């Protein structure tokens, strides 16, 4: 049994030495022939990742600037639209005031014209009435002169002429 254990331990030791030597040779071969290519690939990959991160940060910064610019433009647009609305309201108020003042002037003119027409018609009516009264007075006086009337006939004649005057 002791021989089996020594054999097994020498086989394990031999295998260990062989694997370790193979591994060391493999590392040396990789180091000599492929190490620069492998590290170059890793460096290239690291540079690409760093560049991608930098580009992403730049795009993020540009996007944040664009968002801020759009927000500023939106605020400016709102301010301008409020100013336009306020100006339109002010112009509308001024136009309303002007129209009302113009309407008042026209109304005053129409009132004055109507008043003048009323006064003219009143004067015309008074003149017509004066002419009619004068004609009636002359007619009545001529009748009184032509007829010698007693008191009763005189009253009847005046009443008839007053009735005639009321009909006109």
UniProtKB/Swiss-Prot annotation:
Pfam families: ATP-synt_B. One of its GO terms (cellular component) is plasma membrane. Belongs to the ATPase B chain family. Disulfide bonds: none annotated. Keywords: ATP synthesis, Cell membrane, CF(0), Hydrogen ion transport, Ion transport, Membrane, Transmembrane, Transmembrane helix, Transport. It is found in: Cell membrane. Its main location: membrane. It is a single-pass membrane protein. HAMAP family: ATP_synth_b_bprime. The chain crosses the membrane at residues 10-30. F-type ATPases have 2 components, F(1) - the catalytic core - and F(0) - the membrane proton channel. F(1) has five subunits: alpha(3), beta(3), gamma(1), delta(1), epsilon(1). F(0) has three main subunits: a(1), b(2) and c(10-14). The alpha and beta chains form an alternating ring which encloses part of the gamma chain. F(1) is attached to F(0) by a central stalk formed by the gamma and epsilon chains, while a peripheral stalk is formed by the delta and b chains. F(1)F(0) ATP synthase produces ATP from ADP in the presence of a proton or sodium gradient. F-type ATPases consist of two structural domains, F(1) containing the extramembraneous catalytic core and F(0) containing the membrane proton channel, linked together by a central stalk and a peripheral stalk. During catalysis, ATP synthesis in the catalytic domain of F(1) is coupled via a rotary mechanism of the central stalk subunits to proton translocation. GO terms for molecular function: proton-transporting ATP synthase activity, rotational mechanism; proton-transporting ATPase activity, rotational mechanism. This is ATP synthase subunit b.
């Amino acid at each position: 049994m002791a021989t089996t254990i020594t054999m097994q331990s020498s086989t394990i030791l031999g295998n260990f030495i062989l694997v370790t030597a193979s591994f060391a040779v493999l590392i040396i071969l990789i180091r000599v022939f492929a190490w620069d290519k492998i590290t170059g690939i890793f460096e290239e990959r690291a540079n690409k990742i760093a560049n991608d991160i930098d580009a992403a940060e730049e795009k993020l910064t540009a996007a944040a600037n664009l968002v801020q610019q759009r927000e500023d433009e939106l605020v400016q647009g709102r301010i301008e639209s409020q100013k336009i609305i306020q100006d339109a309201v002010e112009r509308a108020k001024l136009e309303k005031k002007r129209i009302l003042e113009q309407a008042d002037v026209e109304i005053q003119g129409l009132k004055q014209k109507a008043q003048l027409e009323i006064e003219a018609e009143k004067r015309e009516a008074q003149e017509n009435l004066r002419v009619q009264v004068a004609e009636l007075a002359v007619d009545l006086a001529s009748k009184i002169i032509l007829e010698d009337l007693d008191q009763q006939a005189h009253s009847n004649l005046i009443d008839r002429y007053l009735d005639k005057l009321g009909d006109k």
